Amino acid sequence: MYSFMGGGLFCAWVGTILLVVAMATDHWMQYRLSGSFAHQGLWRYCLGNKCYLQTDSIAYWNATRAFMILSALCAISGIIMGIMAFAHQPTFSRISRPFSAGIMFFSSTLFVVLALAIYTGVTVSFLGRRFGDWRFSWSYILGWVAVLMTFFAGIFYMCAYRVHECRRLSTPR
């Protein structure tokens, strides 16, 4: 059980760090505009060497930002639940802590997939046509790696829950 929780905590830490880095950086998309290099993220865009805040309140920007923030919050709360499960803190005695941590990581995975799907759909259908020479960049890719890490953290915690439940049911009372 502890090896599953240790693997879950490792994946959770890495996934959460990747989520925060992907959300905070401005290299989701790179393109050429009027012959100069430009890139943009969720919060700002840069033309040449000068960066500007994204002040437009466009629905897909707001949805992507909101889902990324929700994903990071779920991942952080999953880490807290995972640490409590690892340390056997008796805070929630009626609720399985590994199961709760697994659910939080699966929720985090769902939210980041929704954010990346919205961003991908709008970028490919609208912005991709607007800018001829464009590509997704490393911040966007970190978001997809964070999907894998939070998903595997959820898998590890569900396995830890299953091992714990099998041991609990097999011991005589």
UniProtKB/Swiss-Prot annotation:
PANTHER family: EPITHELIAL MEMBRANE PROTEIN-RELATED, LENS FIBER MEMBRANE INTRINSIC PROTEIN. It is found in: Membrane. Glycans are attached at residues 43, 61-62. It comes from the Eukaryota. Residues 1-3, 88-98, 162-173 are cytoplasmic. GO terms for cellular component: cell junction; plasma membrane; vesicle. The keyword ATP-binding does not apply. InterPro entries: LMIP (IPR003935), PMP-22/EMP/MP20-like (IPR050579), PMP22/EMP/MP20/Claudin (IPR004031), PMP22_EMP_MP20 (IPR004032). The modification Phosphoserine is found at residue 170. The chain crosses the membrane at residues 4-24, 67-87, 99-119, 141-161. The modification Phosphothreonine is found at residue 171. It is linked to Cataract, multiple types 19: An opacification of the crystalline lens of the eye that frequently results in visual impairment or blindness. Opacities vary in morphology, are often confined to a portion of the lens, and may be static or progressive. In general, the more posteriorly located and dense an opacity, the greater the impact on visual function. One of its GO terms (biological process) is lens development in camera-type eye. Pfam families: PMP22_Claudin. Keywords: Cataract, Disease variant, Disulfide bond, Eye lens protein, Glycoprotein, Membrane, Phosphoprotein, Transmembrane, Transmembrane helix. Belongs to the PMP-22/EMP/MP20 family. This is Lens fiber membrane intrinsic protein. It is a multi-pass membrane protein. Residues 25-66, 120-140 are extracellular. The gene is LIM2. Seems to be associated with itself or another lens membrane component via disulfide bonds. Its main location: membrane. Eye lens specific. Present in the thicker 16-17 nm junctions of mammalian lens fiber cells, where it may contribute to cell junctional organization. Acts as a receptor for calmodulin. May play an important role in both lens development and cataractogenesis. One of its GO terms (molecular function) is structural constituent of eye lens.
